[in-house]
Swiss-Prot record:
SUPFAM superfamilies linked to this entry: beta-beta-alpha zinc fingers
Protein location: Nucleus
Transmembrane among keywords: no
Chain positions of all zinc fingers (C2H2-type): 1-21, 27-49, 55-62
Keywords per UniProt: Activator, DNA-binding, Metal-binding, Nucleus, Repeat, Transcription, Transcription regulation, Zinc, Zinc-finger
Function: Sequence-specific DNA-binding transcription factor. Binds to two specific DNA sites located in the promoter region of HOXA4.
PANTHER family xref list: E3 SUMO-PROTEIN LIGASE EGR2, KRUEPPEL-LIKE TRANSCRIPTION FACTOR
Similarity comment: family membership: Belongs to the EGR C2H2-type zinc-finger protein family.
GO molecular function, one term: DNA-binding transcription factor activity, RNA polymerase II-specific
Source organism phylogeny: Eukaryota, Metazoa, Chordata, Craniata, Vertebrata
Protein name: Early growth response protein 2
Keyword presence, Nucleus: yes
Any GO CC annotation of this UniProt entry: nucleus
Domain of life: Eukaryota
Length: 62
């Protein structure tokens, strides 16, 4: 893209970066139909629907 001077050592990183310029969001939540450019963002988002909290504090258990 014009004005973008980013470089990447891996093609998958470039593919992910290009989505910033194109607005392409290929990952869709099946519950609310919201779209995301990255699969890890979709995974985190789905937890808002399921209530899953996979990380607990080692000190207090919360």
């Amino acid at each position: 893209a014009e004005g973008c001077d980013r470089g990447f050592s891996r093609s998958d990183e470039l593919t992910r970066h290009i989505r910033i310029h194109t607005g392409h969001k290929p990952f869709q939540c099946r519950i609310c139909m919201r779209n995301f450019s990255r699969s890890d963002h979709l995974t985190t988002h789905i937890r808002t629907h399921t209530g899953e909290k996979p990380f607990a504090c080692d000190y207090c258990g919360r």
